[in-house]
């Protein structure tokens, strides 16, 4: 059998010399080591194609470079090395390299009061690039929380006041009777509406970080809002959650401002943008607010 050289179509010159901003692959399944364990990630990998006369890039070289994340932890340095490999394998063709990783980060969260605990999953995206010789990394997280409408709470309190006035008008106030009334559905005739809400935060990381501060960012977001959704609970935890919601009444504007102030205190953040979405239980539409700093 005659030995033939395999054709390399990508190396051929193209008659239409048009540079391309991004060429690569999306949706690559990849195990990565993060926070002491292996997680299933999806990767988008690409480079620019400045040499417009070149037919294409060498996608297999990008794919093989990603194997580094199977052997070492996912850190800014590891990501930078992969992007450098992308460029080295496309010398003369590309001046910019890009990598996006998405995965779910699991954290075991304690209940508010009881000794119970359970796992929560947070959607994480890491966007990195080398452009004009500069390395940039952005970290995005999606954090669910509960929000209770301040207006609805005020209206509910007014209805309770009216019911109290109707039930006790012209009577001598008896402490035990009032306590019983307060604990009954006849007394508490209205409750404010609340909903599961979502905070989406994107942070541009500083240049000298040795780790990706995923858990720290999630903790700061949940602490600033005060109403993180729960996992395993007993009745005491559910009561504590009701108290937390009552003490943290929030319009979407309030939530966005809380997050903005909290994120500005992170010295490792060069810039950020955020978006909060309250999936209204009163309306068929969502209430949304957004903010950004140095973005």
Swiss-Prot record:
Alphabetized GO MF terms: GTP cyclohydrolase I activity
InterPro entries with a match to the protein in the record: GTP_cyclohydrolase_FolE2, GTP_cyclohydrolase_FolE2/MptA
NCBIfam families assigned: PRK13674.1-1
Residue stretches in coiled coil: none
Domain of life of the native organism: Bacteria
Organism expressing this protein natively: Pseudomonas putida (strain W619)
Cleavable signal peptide: none
GO biological process: one example: tetrahydrofolate biosynthetic process
EC assignment: 3.5.4.16
Function statement: Converts GTP to 7,8-dihydroneopterin triphosphate.
HAMAP family cross-referenced by the UniProt entry: GTP_cyclohydrol_B
Pathways involved: Cofactor biosynthesis; 7,8-dihydroneopterin triphosphate biosynthesis; 7,8-dihydroneopterin triphosphate from GTP: step 1/1
Name of the featured protein: GTP cyclohydrolase FolE2
Family classification: Belongs to the GTP cyclohydrolase IV family.
Keywords of this entry: Hydrolase
Gene3D superfamilies with a match to the protein in the record: Urate Oxidase (3.10.270.10)
Site (May be catalytically important): 149
EC primary class: hydrolase
Reactions catalysed: GTP + H2O = 7,8-dihydroneopterin 3'-triphosphate + formate + H(+)
């Amino acid at each position: 059998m005659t030995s033939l050289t395999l054709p390399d179509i990508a190396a051929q010159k193209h008659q239409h010399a048009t540079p391309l901003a991004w060429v690569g692959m999306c949706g690559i399944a990849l195990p990565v080591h993060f926070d002491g364990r292996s997680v299933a990630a999806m990767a988008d990998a690409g480079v620019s194609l400045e040499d417009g006369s070149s037919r294409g890039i060498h996608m297999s070289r990008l794919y093989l470079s990603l194997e580094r994340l199977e052997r070492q932890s996912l850190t800014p340095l590891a990501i930078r090395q992969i992007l450098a490999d992308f460029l080295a394998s496309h010398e003369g063709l590309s001046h910019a390299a890009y990598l996006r990783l998405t995965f779910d980060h699991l954290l075991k969260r304690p209940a508010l009061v009881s000794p119970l605990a359970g796992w929560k999953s947070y959607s994480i995206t890491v966007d990195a690039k080398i452009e004009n010789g500069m390395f940039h990394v952005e970290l995005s997280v999606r954090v669910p929380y509960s929000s209770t409408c301040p207006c609805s709470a005020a209206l509910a309190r007014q209805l309770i006041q009216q019911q109290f006035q109707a039930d006790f008008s012209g009577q001598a106030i008896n402490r035990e009777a009032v306590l019983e009334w307060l604990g009954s559905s006849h007394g508490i005739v209205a409750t404010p509406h609340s909903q599961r809400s979502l905070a989406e935060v994107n942070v541009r990381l500083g240049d000298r970080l040795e780790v990706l501060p995923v858990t720290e960012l999630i903790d700061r977001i949940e602490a600033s809002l005060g109403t993180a959704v729960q996992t395993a609970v007993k009745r005491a935890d559910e009561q504590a959650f009701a108290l937390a919601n009552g003490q943290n009444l929030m319009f979407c504007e309030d939530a966005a401002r809380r997050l903005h102030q909290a994120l500005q205190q992170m010295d490792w953040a060069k810039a950020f943008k955020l978006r909060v979405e309250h999936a209204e239980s009163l309306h068929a539409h969502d209430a949304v607010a957004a903010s950004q700093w140095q973005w």
